[in-house]
Amino acid sequence: MIKTTTFTKRLLIGVLSTAPFFAHSAENIELPATLAMTAYGTGSAGYTQMVSIGNLLQNEYGTSVRILPGENDVSRMTPLRMGRVPLCACGIASYYGFEGVLLFADPQWGPQSIRLISTSTATFGMGVAVAGDINVKTPADLKGKRVAYIRGDDANNIGTEAFLAFGGLTWDDVERVEFPGYGRSFEGIVANQADAAFTMSVAPTAQQVAASPRGIVWPELDPANKEGWQRLQAIAPYFQPHNVTAAAGKNYGKDSPWVGATYPYPILVGNESLDDKTARNLVRVLIEDHDKYKDAAPGNTGYSLENQNMQWVIPYHDAVVEYYKEIGHWTDAMQVHQDGLVKRQNLLKTTWESFMGANPPEDRDAFRSGWMEARANALEAEGMKPVFR
């Protein structure tokens, strides 16, 4: 499952020879007069990027973009589920929605019929930031160390668990220190109450640790360590190896990258029912007009064609696939991968419908257990990995 930026760039050498050179604005763009979407809260990188893309759409094509900021996964995903907005600039919760797990293992949710439009994979990474004074070089060195666990933050804790797995560790091999929130976990590192916590490599919280007397280090994830990556991706398959050139700490930069990991942020998704014209024209603008907005907000470089992971964990919208075929950026292997994801999505939806139609338990915990068991059984019967149980 390992996918790297290097692979994508090698692939491009072959496919871009037949693809058009995008030197001018995308032509014959047809988008709605108003396009609404949800995003992370104001001040977040995702919100700032959507504002810059909205400015491009307004100035070049007369489309007004209305952004609804949401402070948590529920507030970002609910308008998409209810059909109040056609798009969400989401985080990794979009993948959990696709799978119907965690907060989506709920009677009000279930597997979501979402499709990928585009993602941003820029110079930052995602991983476990570690205090620089405890001699940690790889995830295996975290054994016996104090690792932050955030109450109510599934995405964060799964990321931490995946990094521990890379080093052959579990929560039982470390001292789990619980915190009530993400920010408090990093205050805990500075105050010497914890040694490690999960975050984005350029986040203010990571900068806070880097500026403290303890300093900061990012444990190396050697891409040649196939077994380590298999363990990590068995827990969190959305991670991919990445040479991170933007990371907190004086020892990291363009010439001395953190050999680590990342996953896209934000993740621009729509429902499967999003009309083809909107999906197609939006991805055309994002790809063909990239030079016009790539410097307008931090992270916008990540929307370039070469930064798209064409074999990720959420299926592309059908109209996006057709666009990539037309420009020569689609292979047989990509189609096989896409077909597999669509098959998984359809199986999850039919399994959910059967489960909901069989008088499921009213108790939330019993409901979740029953659904997760039915889900795992259905996936395994088709030779697919449940990932979550």
Where are the language model's segments positioned?
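Sec-exported extracytoplasmic/periplasmic mature domains
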Residues: 55-62, 81-85, 165-169, 190-194, ...
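Ligand-binding clefts/hinges and TM-proximal coupling segments of bilobed small-molecule sensing domains
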Residues: 144-162, 238-303, 308-313
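An extracytoplasmic/periplasmic, membrane-proximal ligand-sensing/linker region
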Residues: 32, 201-214, 218, 277-279, ...
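Pocket-lining segment of extracytoplasmic ligand-binding domains
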Residues: 92-94, 101-108, 134, 171-173, ...
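Bacterial N-terminal signal peptides
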Residues: 10-20
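Bacterial N-terminal signal peptides that target proteins for export
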Residues: 2-12
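Sec/Tat signal peptide C-region and signal peptidase I cleavage site
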Residues: 21-25
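Short, glycine-/small- and polar/acidic-enriched structural segments
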Residues: 27-152, 156-166, 177, 218
